[in-house]
A protein has these predicted regions:
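A short, Lys/Arg-enriched amphipathic alpha-helix followed by its capping loop at the start of a domain
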Residues: 32, 36, 40, 113-122
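A metal-dependent, Asp-based hydrolase signature
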Residues: 39, 48-98
Length: 236
C-alpha cells in the first residue's frame, strides 16, 4: 500500500537496529560476560540472570547503556555469590563503556534512502528513539546521518503518551505521521494505537524485553529492505 493518498507530513525513524546495528554489540558483551563468569555459572544462567536483573531495574534505571552496565555488574555479583574480583568488575565496566563507542555504521540502504527522502523535500524527517540522551546523540553524530533530520527526540519509554506528545510537538496529527522501526513493541504497536501509519522493518536480533506478539493492521506495512520505504512514500 502506498501512502500517496494520505496527508503524510512527518516520517519518524527509530534509531537502534533501524538506522544502525546495536543489539548485536550488546549480545557480544553478554557473551563475554558469560566467559568471565564461567567458574561460577553457565552462559545460559548468566543470560537468564541478566534478563531478570534488567527487568527488575527497568522502573528505576530505564533503558540504555548505563542501565545495562549496572545490571551487568549486579548480575555478576549475584552469579558469583559475592566472590567476584575487582579485576572482573573493572572488565565488566569497560565492556559497558565500549557500548558507548562502537561504530554506528548505517545499515544497508539506510543512507541512500534517507538522502532520497531528504532531497525529495515533501516529508519532514525526524528521529524518535528510546534510551539515554547523550548516548543517542553521540550515536547519531557518529553515524553521519544527522544532517538528514530536522529533529531528534530521545525518551525513556515509547508508549502512546510519548507518540501523542511527539505529534503535538511537531504540530501534526497522528494520521499525518509515519513511524519506521524494527521493534513491534516500541515502534509499531503504540504508534498504531494513537492513529499513526507505521512501517515495520524487523532486525535479525531482538532484545528479549522488546519481544511481543505481532498482528496485522490497516495502517501497518512490513518490509524487508530499507529502500522499500521509497516506494511506499512514492519517492523516485
Amino acid at each position: 500500500m502506498r501512502l500517496t493518498d494520505q496527508e503524510i507530513k512527518v516520517v519518524a525513524f527509530d534509531a537502534d537496529d533501524t538506522l544502525w546495528d546495536c543489539q548485536s554489540w550488546f549480545d557480544d558483551v553478554e557473551r563475554e560476560c558469560g566467559e568471565l563468569l564461567k567458574p561460577w555459572a553457565t552462559q545460559e544462567e548468566v543470560t537468564k540472570g541478566l534478563f531478570a536483573t534488567e527487568r527488575g531495574n527497568m522502573e528505576l534505571l530505564g533503558y540504555g547503556t548505563k542501565a545495562f552496565t549496572i545490571s551487568l555488574v549486579e548480575n555478576a555479583v549475584k552469579m558469583t555469590h559475592g566472590e567476584i574480583t575487582g579485576d572482573i568488575v573493572l572488565r565488566l565496566i569497560e565492556l559497558g563503556k565500549s557500548l558507548l563507542r562502537f561504530p554506528t555504521n548505517p545499515l544497508p540502504e539506510v543512507k541512500e534512502t534517507l538522502k532520497r527522502l531528504y532531497d525529495d523535500g515533501r516529508y519532514r524527517l525526524v528521529v524518535f528513539t528510546k534510551g539515554e540522551l547523550l548516548d543517542q546523540e553521540s550515536k547519531l553524530k557518529r553515524s553521519g546521518l544527522a544532517g538528514f533530520f530536522e529533529y531528534m527526540e530521545t525518551v525513556s519509554n515509547k508508549g502512546m503518551d510519548e507518540y501523542v506528545a511527539l505529534c503535538e510537538h511537531l504540530g501534526v496529527s497522528p494520521n499525518e505521521m509515519v513511524m519506521v522501526g524494527n521493534s513491534f513493541r516500541s515502534d509499531i504497536a503504540p504508534a498504531l494505537a494513537v492513529g499513526c501509519y507505521t512501517i515495520h522493518i524487523p532486525y535479525h536480533v531482538v532484545w528479549e524485553l522488546e519481544k511481543t506478539e505481532e498482528y496485522p493492521h490497516e495502517h501497518l506495512q512490513k518490509i524487508s529492505a530499507f529502500s522499500e520505504i521509497l516506494d511506499i512514500l512514492s519517492v523516485k
